Amino acid sequence: MVKINGEELNIAGKTVAEYLATTKYDPKRIAVERNGDIVPKVQYADTVLQDGDSVEVVSFVGGG
């Protein structure tokens, strides 16, 4: 199980890019943290989520 934003999901073995494709997140407007480290956008397709990972997806919103 992978914990994403506090929710346990059975997505071990998928890449960050594969997970994001199943969500409504806009990859241009988010940051992904995996086990305390920011995942660079260029590595989303190569970063495989593993059992026990803790992931936070943070969305950026405009404002003023």
Roles of regions detected by a PLM:
Residues M1-G63:
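Ubiquitin-like/PB1-type beta-grasp interaction modules and other compact soluble beta-rich domains
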